[in-house]
Amino acid sequence: EQMGVQVVTLWLLSTDNLSRDPAELSPLLDIIAHAVDELAETGRWRLRLVGAVDLLPEPLAERLRAAVARSQPPEAKAEGKKGEVVDPEDRPMQVNIAVGYGGRQEIADAVRELLRERAAAGASLEEVAASLSEEDITDHLYTKGQPDPDLVIRTSGEQRLSGFLLWQSVHSEYYFCEVNWPAFRRVDFLRALRDFASRERRLGR
């Protein structure tokens, strides 16, 4: 918030993680639920679930949805009164909680939702294929309505993307950090921002 960041996405659990042994997965799910509850209770940020929530155990999915609901500001504060436009600077920071998230899964879900929407409107498959655009898919992603990430921080020293925000990160800058996520400190974040600020972004040009 102090650095003017408007949107942050925390990837807490991938779709691949869901195939772990139950004895290993259960404690991890408890940790995630507790962490999201704590984020919601602060009242400082708007939370949004990003992922295939239907793949999660139902008790966890319900708990996460409840936490997200608690984090939403009053309508008057979020949208303004009587049509008043609210300055984006006055809105709480958006924190995306990526749980049950996979980049390929997100794109598949976006295309599936788009096809269902067009079919309900009476369009044929041929008509959908003829008119399909990148913007159509973007508008059906989990993060629809949000800007693409400027910076992706990969912790734990791994030199791979693991499918994180595959569609959205086409022009993102990447920063690889040796520190594991639970030990990630403010100073590590500031180093990442400093490194990012020193780069000349070409945005595909």
Language model features with spans:
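Flexible, compositionally biased loop and terminal segments
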Residues: E1-R205
